[in-house]
Each structure stands twice: as C-alpha cells, then as structure tokens.
Curated annotation (Swiss-Prot):
Its cofactor is Zn(2+); Co(2+). Catalyzes the hydrolysis of N-succinyl-L,L-diaminopimelic acid (SDAP), forming succinate and LL-2,6-diaminopimelate (DAP), an intermediate involved in the bacterial biosynthesis of lysine and meso-diaminopimelic acid, an essential component of bacterial cell walls. Zn(2+) 1 binds at residues 64, 95, 154. Belongs to the peptidase M20A family. DapE subfamily. Keywords: Amino-acid biosynthesis, Cobalt, Diaminopimelate biosynthesis, Hydrolase, Lysine biosynthesis, Metal-binding, Zinc. It catalyses: N-succinyl-(2S,6S)-2,6-diaminopimelate + H2O = (2S,6S)-2,6-diaminopimelate + succinate. One of its GO terms (biological process) is L-arginine biosynthetic process. CDD domains: M20_DapE_proteobac. PROSITE patterns: ARGE_DAPE_CPG2_2. Homodimer. The active site is at residues 66, 125. GO terms for molecular function: acetylornithine deacetylase activity; metal ion binding; succinyl-diaminopimelate desuccinylase activity. This is Succinyl-diaminopimelate desuccinylase.
Length: 367
C-alpha cells in the first residue's frame, strides 16, 4: 500500500467528530512493530504509537482523524473518495487525513532513526477538543514520554505546496462586557441611566484598536467587537443593560491581563461586569530549533522552495503541545477547500508531503 492508497482507505472511514469510525484501529494494525496506547474518554478515542530505535531525541507526528460533517453541495459522496483529474475528493482530504496518511506511511517505512519516533492521533479536534490531545499529553507526561519535538500535519500551505509552515499560532481571548444602567422612558432621559450613551462615548477609542504593534511573526493584537446589544427593540424605552462581546487574537506580546487593563481604562468609573476567557494561548517555536531546520531543508529538497514561517490562521491542537514546552510546528497540504463542499487535494501534494516527512525524519537527528 502506498501513501495514496492509504489516504483513500482513511477517507473511507466516516469519522465525523468525535467518532473515529474504526480508523484508529486500522492505523494501529497498519503500523506493526509500534507499541500502541489508547486513552479514551467520553466517546473520544486517542491513540499513541511509538517505537524506540536507539538513544536520542523523541520526534512525534500528531494529528486528528475526525472530520467536520459533510453538509450540502457535494458532487460526489463525501465519504466515498474519488479521483478526478489528479485530485482526490472526499471530506477530510485537506483537513487532515492527507497529513495523517503522509506521516503514517513515512513512519512505517523508516528503518533506522537515532532516537524514538511516535504518532499521536485523536478523534476530538474538530469538536470541543476537551478529551482529545490534551488528555493524551497528560498521560504521556505521567509516564515520562513527552516528545522533544512534534510536527502537526494540519494543512498550512496557501497557494503552492511547500510555501508555508506554522511556527506558532495566535491566541484567542473572548470577552463579554455588561454595562448596567437604569431603564426608563425615552421622553424622560434625565430619570434613567442609558448605558448606550455611556458606552458610545468610549467605542471610538476601543473598536479595532491594536493592543500591541506585533513583530516579525505576529500581526498586532486587535480588539474586535463581535456583538453589541441592548434594549427591547422599541423606540420609547431606554435600556437598563448593554452587552458587548469581543475577541482578541493575541500575540505573545499581549496577555489576558493586558486585555483586562485595556477595558478598564475606558470603563473605569462605570458600573460594569467583565468576563474574560483565554480559549487559546499564543505560542512561538524558535525558528532556530532543530525541528524547524529539518522541515525547512526537507521542503527545499522536495519542493525546491523556501517556506515562509507563519503564525496566521485559527487555532489547532498544536497549542496544547506547545503548552508542555515541546518544540511544535505545523505543515501540510494547501488549505483552500477545508470544511467546504467538494473538499479535495491533489495526488501530487500527498506524495510530496510524504516525501517531505521522510526527509524530515532523516534530517532531524543530523543536526
């Protein structure tokens, strides 16, 4: 079975999150000679496969086998993969069974490595991600088997295969402000406290404001208002409360505490409540780390281009891996049809991704 055959097999599993649909058991059977550990919880399955070749660093490949629901608009059955004009059509081709197939095949064919190789797979990335990669990492920490470096095979490329790897990700701070007032009659504004009028005074100083200047890897952390509501949709009653929701995709330069201080600067003296939640923590892997060099060199050899180092996009399970002080980066196929009808990737990309991972395994322990 080659890497394309393997991908076609993985795509045939209807693994809509959090159901792995038997795909993890298949991968376990496919990687003979690797020690398998399952950590399952609340209907989520997580699989860790590992093999120690010799003393040396521990390199892990990570990903997810679950996919989002197919939805409407497909020209073919989304769970019966088909090949048309060099492209493979099915749910999960880009996000991210192509990546899983590529690293599973590369690891399977590895005969010699100066250290330990492993694979971490979950069926809970597209959902809440509560019982997925996080709990497997906790288990690995308990048995002292956390990797030194990790590649997450999420689709990272933008317009050409090999053009971008993720060396970090922005974080995400979600916030809700409730400004309290006193409801009243619109004809008697002096007898009420209209929260809209108060908040309207500070909105120009807050909406779309950058909380930092960014750097060579991260753009500025911007205060983005996502929802603003008050009142009862009538014209003669002023509201007693206003709710404002916002999001900050934060770089490593801005913390949750910085966001709190920013809000307080403009709401100081007002009667308000603030709720903040850091749903993802920003991280950056030093571009001088061995895993970054190994992947860069491998892409240059296979694709003939030098990838840019990016932190753009949303969040992924790499944030959990980085939290355990593991050097983590992400690389995969072009991401132009992820979560869309007729999701597809090219056979050429899949084969090149497999070659890149094979070369990365070689380069990683060569310094």
């Amino acid at each position: 079975m080659n890497v394309v055959d393997l991908l076609m097999k993985l795509l045939s599993f209807k693994s809509v999150t959090p159901d792995d649909a038997g795909s993890l058991a298949f991968i376990e059977s496919y990687l003979k000679g690797y020690e398998a550990t399952y950590v399952n919880k609340e209907g989520v399955k997580n699989l860790f496969l590992t093999k120690k070749f010799s003393e040396g660093p521990h390199l892990c490949f990570a990903g997810h086998v679950d996919v989002v629901p197919a939805g409407d608009g497909w020209h073919t059955n989304p769970f019966v993969p088909v090949i048309k004009e060099g492209k493979i059509y099915a749910r999960g081709t880009q996000d991210m069974k192509s990546g899983v197939a590529a690293f599973v095949q590369a690891v399977k064919e590895c005969e010699d490595f100066s250290g330990r190789l492993s694979i971490l797979l979950t069926s809970d990335e597209e959902g809440d991600a509560t019982y997925g990669t996080q709990i497997m990492l906790q288990h690995l920490k308990e048995i002292d088997l956390l990797p030194d470096a990790c590649i997450v095979a999420e689709p990272t490329c933008e317009t050409a295969f090999g053009d971008a790897i993720k060396v970090g990700r922005r974080g995400s701070v979600n916030g809700v402000i409730e400004k309290h007032g006193i409801q009243g009659h619109a004809a008697y504004p002096e007898k009420a406290k209209n929260p809209i009028h108060k908040v309207a005074q500070v909105l120009p100083m807050m909406a779309g404001v950058n909380l930092d200047e960014g750097d060579e890897f991260f753009g500025p952390s911007q205060f983005v208002i996502t929802d603003l509501r008050a009142g009862m949709e009538v014209t003669n009653v002023t509201p007693g409360k206003l709710k404002m929701m916002f999001n900050v995709r934060n770089s490593t330069e801005t913390t949750l505490e910085d966001v709190e201080k920013f809000v307080h600067t403009y709401f100081n003296g007002m009667d308000y409540d603030l709720t903040l939640k850091q749903s993802a923590t920003p991280f950056l892997t030093d571009p001088d780390r061995p895993i970054v060099h190994a992947l860069d060199e491998s892409i240059q050899k296979v694709c003939g281009i030098t990838p840019k180092h990016s932190t753009a996009g949303g969040t992924s399970d790499a944030r959990f891996i980085a939290a355990d002080n593991i050097d983590v980066i992400e690389f995969g196929v072009i991401n132009d049809t992820i979560h869309a009808p007729n999701e597809r990737t090219s056979i050429e990309e899949v084969e090149k991704l497999y070659e890149v991972f094979k070369e990365t395994i070689k380069y990683f322990t060569q310094g």
